[in-house]
Regions:
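Conserved beta-strand hairpin/beta-sheet module of binuclear metal-dependent hydrolase folds
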Residues: 1-44, 127-150, 168
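Active-site neighborhood of phospho(di)ester-bond hydrolases with catalytic His/Asp-centered motifs
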Residues: 28-31, 51-59, 79-82, 147-150, ...
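Active-site metal-binding motif and surrounding structural segment of the metallo-beta-lactamase
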Residues: 34-80
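Active-site environment of divalent metal-dependent phosphoester hydrolases
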Residues: 61-64, 85-88, 123-124, 155-157, ...
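Metallo-beta-lactamase
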Residues: 81-143
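Cap/insert and terminal regions of metallo-dependent hydrolase folds
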Residues: 157-254
Length: 268
């Protein structure tokens, strides 16, 4: 069975994805209610009862609010670093089945090799993940990997090193710089937070990262996620990344739900 990634939803309203291998089914983040996650999984042909674990990037509600309902499943492992686990648990009455990892250490969960790495964001200890599977010399299951990188204000060199060489990349393209600047509903302080070094990635910075990684030869597919509903649009993101479509498969996750059509190929 090929490894599948289903982005169940991604926006400031909630983030959650299903990573499914032949032997393992995990959620990356749980930014919706447990009931909503269950419905989204059913739409993807999966059951919440079949989920083997949850991996959390950080404690913000659009990534972790579903843990409240999932905590009723007493034996469901939830992987997080200590600061994230403590921040989430402090808001709950039920004890979560925490599996604490140290940032930067590789560990095995079933048929997945997992490594976390710090990313700059205004939470206690935000991380990204790489997930790897397959074996050298196995014609039916060769080595493959995926990087999950959302909620970061800029891309340090060490983050680039962690994600260089993956075949699939999930990266945020949160806002268009001009739309954010012109937005009259957000106060100046909020705009500064969003575009600061512990905020979110603009379309421009996300594009520069993907363009650089596209020259490495290993990257095959990119998922653009966490689009702002107010300060970004599918059309702007599509136009920005269109010139890379001849090199990569690019999937834009609609913040209203679903997947936007692929960019039309243009010359960079």
């Amino acid at each position: 069975m090929p490894v599948e990634l289903h982005i169940l939803g991604s926006s400031s309203g909630g983030n959650c994805a299903l990573l499914r291998t032949g032997h393992t089914k995990v959620l990356v983040d749980a930014g919706f209610s447990a009931k909503r996650i269950s419905l989204l999984l059913e739409a993807a042909g999966e059951s919440l009862d079949a989920i083997d674990a949850v991996f959390l990037t950080h404690e913000h509600s659009d990534h972790a609010q579903g843990i409240r309902g999932l905590a009723k499943r007493a034996h469901l492992p939830v992987f997080a670093n200590r600061d994230t686990a403590e921040a989430v648990q402090a808001k709950l009455t039920k004890k979560v089945c925490w599996q604490i990892f140290q940032n930067g250490m590789e560990f095995i969960f079933r048929d997945l090799k997992v490594r976390s790495f710090c990313v700059p964001h205004d939470a206690y200890d935000t991380v990204g993940f790489t997930f790897a599977w397959g074996e050298e010399g196995d014609l039916f299951s060769p080595p493959r990997s995926l990087a999950w990188v959302t909620d970061l204000g800029y891309v340090p060199e060490y983050v680039k090193e962690h994600i260089r060489g993956v075949q699939k990349l999930v990266i945020e393209a949160n806002y268009d710089e001009d739309l954010l600047e012109r937005d009259k509903r957000r106060p100046w302080s909020t705009k500064q937070r969003i575009r600061g070094r512990h905020g979110h990635l603009s379309n421009r910075v996300a594009f520069e990262l993907v363009e650089a990684l596209s020259t490495c030869g290993s990257l095959q597919k990119v998922y653009l996620v966490h689009l702002s509903k107010d300060c970004n649009s599918i059309e702007i993101v599509r136009d920005k990344f269109a010139c890379l479509e001849h090199k990569l498969s690019i999937e834009i996750i609609d913040p209203e739900g679903g997947t936007a059509p692929a960019p039309k190929c243009q010359t960079c």
